[in-house]
Amino acid sequence: MNFEQRYRAMETRDESYAGEFFAAVTSTGIYCRPGCPARTPKRENVRFYLTAAAARSDGFRACLRCHP
């Protein structure tokens, strides 16, 4: 999956991608599941990770809404 496909999955809150990747938001320091009900962040503030552990190791914390 490329960046645009992952971002589109976030925009549509597509739960079928749960566990395939995690989205981290640089402006908030939080990482989420693709189906998170939180507002979709701006493209320039998003990084994608294959595991939650990778997002945590880069300093992001788990979202309190979707509990990844």
Positions of PLM-derived features:
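Mature, structured domains enriched in cysteine- and short glycine motifs
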Residues: 1-68
